[in-house]
């Protein structure tokens, strides 16, 4: 048996699977979980793949990309995603997390897939809301958008950031779909003084890129090495990974030179 991952409209990968473990469908999402000899369990959410053995890569990178460039991380907002492992990593800081996800049926179906599902959901500093309007009005130190935001969502979310807050969003991979990344950077630059693309170094099973944006905080100049060294129980993230995430080959430096704001 095989499952197919669409990397771009013109590039696909296939993975061998042994069995389907779960099939859950809601109004807006489809979740299938498969057993794989090489990758443990594989979750397919709306044709995007999550590998249980490698969940820590994205969750560590995004959480500590924000946490280690901020002196304080008191209030965090996560929108448009299901990744509770990201919240688990963020709880390494003294923080409160607002997690916005309307599809409770799909979220609860990840109960056996996310290793820290119960630990996160039962944390007193974790608030799950179905929509942003259900939350108290506040400003955030870090906002993570786990789907590509359109320009209207960017505008709304940036208004919820503190002056030194950090906004991290998913984008297309800069090498695979550089035009899409270029457009995303251009849009982000309409709202932020800092807008820089990055990827997860050595992550071979992903088609994702990301953007780090802020009014004043810089992902490299404001990196705090002592905070990185103090992190416990991390398997992927370190200072070298953080810095390498922003490295671009010469040709992409030229492509993005008018869109990167640093």
Swiss-Prot record:
Q: Which reaction does it catalyse?
A: S-adenosyl 3-(methylsulfanyl)propylamine + putrescine = S-methyl-5'-thioadenosine + spermidine + H(+)
Which residues make up the binding site for S-methyl-5'-thioadenosine?
A: 29
Q: Which major enzyme category is it?
A: transferase
| UniProtKB keywords | Cytoplasm, Polyamine biosynthesis, Spermidine biosynthesis, Transferase
- Biological process (GO) annotations? spermidine biosynthetic process
Provide the residue positions that the database annotates as binding spermidine: 83
On whether Membrane is a keyword of this UniProt record, the answer is no
State the source organism's domain of life.
Bacteria
Give the E.C. number(s).
Answer: 2.5.1.16
**What is its quaternary makeup?**
Homodimer or homotetramer.
What this protein is reported to do is described as: Catalyzes the irreversible transfer of a propylamine group from the amino donor S-adenosylmethioninamine (decarboxy-AdoMet) to putrescine (1,4-diaminobutane) to yield spermidine.
For this entry, the protein name equals Polyamine aminopropyltransferase
Lineage, uppermost ranks = Bacteria, Pseudomonadati, Campylobacterota, Epsilonproteobacteria, Campylobacterales
């Amino acid at each position: 048996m095989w499952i197919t991952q669409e990397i771009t409209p013109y590039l696909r990968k296939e993975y061998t699977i042994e069995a389907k473990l779960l099939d859950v469908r809601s109004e807006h999402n489809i979740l299938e979980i498969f057993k794989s000899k090489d990758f443990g369990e594989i979750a397919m959410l709306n044709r995007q793949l999550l590998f249980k053995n490698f969940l820590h890569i994205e969750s560590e990178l995004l959480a500590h990309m924000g946490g280690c460039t901020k002196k304080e991380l008191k209030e965090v907002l996560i929108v448009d995603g299901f990744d509770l492992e990201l919240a688990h990593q963020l709880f390494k800081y003294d923080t409160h997390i607002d997690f916005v996800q309307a599809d409770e049926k799909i979220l609860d179906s990840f109960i056996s897939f996310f290793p820290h599902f119960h630990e996160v959901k039962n944390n007193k500093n974790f608030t799950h809301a179905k929509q942003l309007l259900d939350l108290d009005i506040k400003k955030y130190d870090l906002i993570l958008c786990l789907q590509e935001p359109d320009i209207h969502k960017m505008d709304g979310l940036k208004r919820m950031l503190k002056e030194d807050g950090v906004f991290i969003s998913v984008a297309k991979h800069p090498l695979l779909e550089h035009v899409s990344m270029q457009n995303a950077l251009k849009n982000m630059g309409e709202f932020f003084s800092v807008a820089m693309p990055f990827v997860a170094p050595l992550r071979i099973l992903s088609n994702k890129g990301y953007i780090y944006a802020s009014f004043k905080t810089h992902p490299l100049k404001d990196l705090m090495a002592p905070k990185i060294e103090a992190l416990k129980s991390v398997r992927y993230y370190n200072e070298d990974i953080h810095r390498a995430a922003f490295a671009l080959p010469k040709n992409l430096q030229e492509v993005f030179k008018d869109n990167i704001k640093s």
